Curated annotation (Swiss-Prot):
Example of a GO cellular component annotation carried by this entry: mitochondrion
Keyword Mitochondrion in annotation: yes
Keyword ATP-binding: no
Protein name: Uncharacterized protein C15D4.11c
Any one biological process term the GO annotation gives: mitochondrial RNA processing
Main location per the UniProt record: mitochondrion
Coiled coil region boundaries: none
Species this chain originates from: Schizosaccharomyces pombe (strain 972 / ATCC 24843) (Fission yeast)
Gene3D superfamilies tied to this protein: Mitochondrial glycoprotein
Amino acid sequence: MLRKAISTARNFKYPLFNCERRFSYFDMFRSKRKFTSGILTEQLALKLDSELGYVKQVLDETLPKKGYEKALHSFIIHEDPSLNYISALKETAKERIRVTVPVYSSRKSYVQTKPITHSAENENGNETSDELVFFQHSIPAYVQLTNNHGTILCALILCKGMLHFDSISFQSPQNSQAFSSDLRLILQKSQKYTGRKTKHVPASIKSSLLEFLDEQGITVKFMKALISRSWRKENVSYKHWIHNIIGFILPSESSTTKKSDSQ
């Protein structure tokens, strides 16, 4: 381009450096940089908007199952937006029960397992996300039962419509820890003998323990309902996160996006 400009100046016998506005590579690169930045911002905004649309669709289509929600009625459910877990509490004169489900996304694992399909029909005719079904069978729930004689701690996993122990431990009253926001840490960091590894516990004992938990209200329906709430909370938090990113890169569009989402 510079060579062409010099040639043109010579042909018309006007010195290049006497032109009113000198040619500047800086100006060219600056305009190109602005143009490129605008394209990248637009591409990012489109991808975010597409992801936002998918998350909103899944949330709209996936409604809590009434049959499962009834299983939560005897518990007090805590869903503090600032905390990265959901807990269910029940207290009687003899014991305290706390079930905690962490909040995290299983999208990556789900995508690696099978392609995402937006919805599927469940047995009650309600719409439910395949991702939610995967989530229910991949995330553990941490159960803590405490009375005057000690604390039973266990992690439960749903598999093929049944509850299975991922870990089981017992702590005597003098070693029992106070109700913790993260029961995983209690299970993982205990330095005292709390029991054998789950795979070495006889199947008959594990079966009886599951029946005992069932009497306390910790059933398959209870677990599915609580984990579903965890899944929904993560997706709602993710939706707000996308809103924040869109508002950051497109400040003028953030108010419009929030209005459309609230409608």
